[in-house]
Every structure is written in structure tokens, then in C-alpha cells.
Amino acid sequence: MADKNFLTEIIDADLAEGKISEIHTRFPPEPNGYLHIGSAKAIYINWSIANQYGGKFNLRLDDTNPAREGEEYVNSIIEDLHWLGADPNGGIFYGSDYFDKCYEYAEKLILEGKAYVDDLTRDEMREYRGADAGKPSRPSPWRDRTPEENLDLFRRMRAGEFQEGEKTLRAKIDLASPNMNMRDPAIYRIKYAEHHRQGNKWCIYPMYDFAHPIQDAIEGITHSMCSLEFENHRPLYNWVIENIFGTEFPKQREFARLNMTNTVMSKRYLRELVEMGIVDGWDDPRMPTLCGLRRRGYTPTSNFTFVREAGISKSDNLIDMRQLEACIRSELDLTAQRRIAVLDPVKLVVDNYPADKTEFFDVANNPNREANDASTRKVAFTRELWIESEDFAEVPPPKFKRLTIGGEVRLMGAYIVKCESVEKNPDGSIAAIHCSADLETGNGNPADGRKVKGTIHWVSADHAVDAEVRLYDKLFTEANMNAIPEGSDYKDYLNPESVVVRKGCKLEESLKDAKPGEKFQFVRTGFFTPDSKNPGVYNRVVTLRDSFKPAK
């Protein structure tokens, strides 16, 4: 690939000026939740740029906060990258592997008078830094401790002599800086929590803004590409690199996050949806998580196509989720084999067809010419069939072209039938629709040349496979969930029809052996995949068509 954008322009300039000889990127998620479609953008940018320049791409699990991280998330992140095909050719690393180095560099800054141990509480530190609008900053009473005193206190912090919040190590930078991140930021805090890899070895942990540039430098990262909210953190990133390593690289650059309509990307909100039982786990097919999209039937190709079409820029924008749907729809239209499924069945009886007869019609697996698939399959035809209830009307509305009393339709791939009568249940519902078939039309048009306008799909009642079908839709009714009124509850915007469950569906016999991961077009209905958790359940990936036209 040869995508060009403002990030590649920066890299091209660095290469042309001889500042670097190869490109090394990384994706550094915190393992405290599951990756989502927004994460796919960061993965795509770092992985594709490394590939584009013949460089290396690392996965680094940024596990510097022991209170929120765990192996469950680590494993899911590794699985998601593998599924996307973005395997890290530079290796898999953990932020916690660098704790010893971070501690060593913190002592270096202390001895050079560039860091000090502070006794201010978190709230006091916020006040002293002038975090409230319009208030000036002022130095902590402990800012001028000697390097020797700071080193002693820092080592005692590590030894566990103080309570959480009692001491903090801060970088000594510039309290007058207009950038709040440069006003003596905290770089180490006390935290008594067992780490998923380090156990109880540490009770002090480096802050992200301190650990991140150190990790990048140790791994040889040349360009640390992250989302736009870290732009104001770049001066601090550079300060750490310059004061510890004395180099220009790694170089941090930022891009706009991917925001999508009718969903939320906040890990806190997503976790709440899971913990409150509003959704069926992190991999619920309505979730924007990669595992949720995978379970719903989205593919790595469709995800990366969507990210690429959304573009790489420094301006925040809101991408219509229908653009993602258009990507998977275009892919599956070419790759998904066609199958017949009746989601709201009503029985149709062909009275003039022998009750003990079964014949098989050859039906195309994918009639799309661009698919270049000439294969067919055998579909059983018997006297009793299932059709969609909406394909029959006793009192048809205007322009109704499907089955009516006295009217004819083509049974897709089989005979033309004419409705002769309707059999009712005691409650007035339809028990069966009785038809006669023109048995000379199995392989073509009627001999008398009459035209039949409607074609409907069907499944043999004797050969049908019972299934549950779940019709998924957008999770939230509000398009821009980032713009809901302040103070409102995001859960008030949940779509009550985000999933409609159809039980008692009738599927053609060939689907009895379908496996999770396979994709099918249910003719006239949509694209579906077997659910990975529940046998006999099919998830709708996306509808068959939509009026949305993706931007060129």
C-alpha cells in the first residue's frame, strides 16, 4: 500500500534528512478493557506505516496501573491484533518489563535536581498547580528539597514506608508554563495493588507520561503516533526524552480519534453496559468492540477499509456507522454464498404435488457476476413449504407483487404457483396457504407466455433447519453521543430495538453444517453468520441494502 498523509510526510522528511534510517512504530493499549473500532484506527496507522516503509511494528501492553489491568484484557488484545492480521513483527512487550529502568531514570532525575518528592495531597497539588481557571500556580513547600533528601524519600516510598497519596515524585520543570502538563507533573505515585505480572514487587508505579517515552526509547521507536488528546502532552514527552536520553527521537505525533455515530467508545461506559447486563458481554454484537464486531460477522478487511476511508487527519470528525456497514456489505456481496431462510414462516401446501415426492433444484451459490462463482447447490422441493408471512396478503395493498388469493408467483428457482385457498386456525390466523403449481415451469417460463411479476423464497418443510435469528441494529438512538446534554444519562439514549429476536425460523438444509465465522446472504433478507456462542443462532451482520452512499 502507499497511503500518504501528514504523518508519512513527517516520516519522509526525517528519512530524507538522514535523521533516521528505518521506521519503528508501536501500538500501546492499556490492558484494562477490550479494543474497539477506534482502536483499529490506531492499530492500522502504526502497523500500515511500518509495513509501508519496511519497518517494525511493536505491540506494547501498557500495564503501568495495577488496579485496573489483567490477563483477560491482555489475551483479548493479542487475539484482536492477530485477527486483524496486524501481527507485531517487532515483538510483544509489556510496560511493566521496564519498571526497573523507569525507577533508575527517576533516581537520575532526582540526583540532577530535576525531580522532587512532594507531600501535597492530590487536591492540594491541583490547587498549587493552578488547575482551576484563572488561578496562578505556586511552588510546593517541598519543591526545594535537596537531591539527597529526595533520593532518601523516594527509596523509602519504594520500601513501602508511606501510605497511598502521602508522597508523590514530581518532575521539576516550569510552574509558569501555559501548558498544565509542564507544571511539575507527577511522575511516580504510591499504589498498593498486586500487579498481574509483577505481583507485589512494587508499591510505586510510574505515571503514563513518564513511562511512555521511556518505553518508546528503550524499544527503539522512531515515531510514537497517538491520538489528538495527547497533543498537549508532547512537550512533556520531549522533556523526558531530552533529559534522560539526550536525543531527538522518539518523536511523538498526533492524529484525530475515530468517532462513530450511534455508539460510545468510552471504556467506562462500555464496562458499565457489560456489568449492568445491558449487553451480553464485551463481545455482544451490538458493541463497537473488535470482539463484538467479529461475533457479529464483520471482517478484518471491512474494518481496515472503513478506517482507511475515514482518513487520517488532525481534525476530529464523526463518521456515520453506515459507512462501516457499507464496507462489510460490499465485501460480503462478493464473498458470501447465498442461502434461503424464512424468518417469519407460514406454511404453503402445493396440493397438486405428490406428498411422497422430493426433487432437487440447482440454485446458484453467488449469482453476482463479479464474484466469479459458477457453483450451485441442491435445494429440496416438497409438497409442503415454508414462505415468509409478509409474502402473502389476503387483501393486498396497491402494487403488491407477491402471493394473493387467485394470484401467481414464482417460487425462487422452482415452480410458478397459484393461491387457491387459505386454511385458518380457530383464532383466525393462517394455518396454511393452499396452492397449485404449474409443473411445466420448473425449468423455465410458462408455455403460454404469461408473465408472473413476483418471486418469493421458500424452504422445504420436510428438510428445514430450525434456528433463532437475531436482527441487530444501532445500540443508541442518538447519532452523536459525544454531544448529548451535559448531566444527561447516556443510557437514556439506548435503542430499545437494538436487537430483535426471531425464534422458529426455517433455514434450508445446507445450513445445518454452517460454522461460526462463515458468512451467508439470506436471499432477500440480509447477511448473516452463525453465532460463536450459541449453536442454532444466526446474527445479522448487516441489512441487504441501505440508502447510504459512502463518500468517494
PLM regions with names:
Residues 3-12, 16-79, 196-227:
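N-terminal catalytic cores of NTP/NDP-binding nucleotidyl/phosphoryl-transfer enzymes
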Residues 16-19, 48-56, 82-89, 217, ...:
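Secondary-structure transition/capping motifs at alpha-helix termini
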Residues 28-32, 60-68, 91-100, 123-124, ...:
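Conserved short loop/turn motifs at secondary-structure junctions
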Residues 63-65, 71, 108-270, 328, ...:
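Active-site cores that bind ATP or allylic diphosphates and position pyrophosphate for catalysis
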Residues 73-100, 105-106, 113-116:
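A glycine-rich helix N-cap at a beta->alpha junction
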Residues 230-234, 238-240, 304, 308-311, ...:
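Core subunits and conserved enzymes of cellular information-processing
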Residues 250-327, 331:
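Long, charged, mostly alpha-helical binding arms that flank functional sites
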